[in-house]
Amino acid sequence: MNYPIMVNLNCKEITIIGGGKIAYRKAKNFIDFGYKVKVISLDFDERFKDIENKTELIRDEYKEEYIENSFIVVAATNNRDVNKSIGMYCAEKNKLANVVDDPTLSSYIVPATIKRGDLIIGVSTSGKSPSLASKIKKDLERVYDDSYEEYIQLLGELRCKILKKYDDPVRKKQL
């Protein structure tokens, strides 16, 4: 069973093993949230050129040394045995791992996500139906459009002012 959680990955090493379409999508997702990513592969999908200034691209085959200091690892190669090896290593070393072709070896999954500034909405079917999660995400994108980015910013500013101005916890909650 999965537990929903938001994780701060600032100053954490993020490593993706693999250079194909899935690896690119995973790297782009981390970058869209403001993180730098290390990607290891012998070959890279051409789209990696679009994000090479925000990634450390290493042209090499997978070696354990590449993930020794990683906090979070994505195994996205086209080789199930390599992915399995990465997943097992991460489990042994208590690292967060997403093995793209074997959810049983993954310690986390990434929900379908909508980001509107500081408003982040994640939708997951716990891997049962990614297409349904994607459909729900599209429905929510229509409801929570780009205007929510500014709205959330305003609410955050108001909340700070209320917290500073009032000492009474009941009053703070009412406001």
Regions found by a protein language model. Name each.
Residues D50-E68:
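Glycine-rich, highly charged phosphate/nucleotide-binding loops
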Residues I72-T77, N83-I109:
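ADP-ribose/adenylate-binding Rossmann-like module
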Residues V99-Y148:
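E1/E1-like adenylate-forming module used to activate ubiquitin-like modifiers
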Residues G127-L175:
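An accessory alpha-helical subdomain
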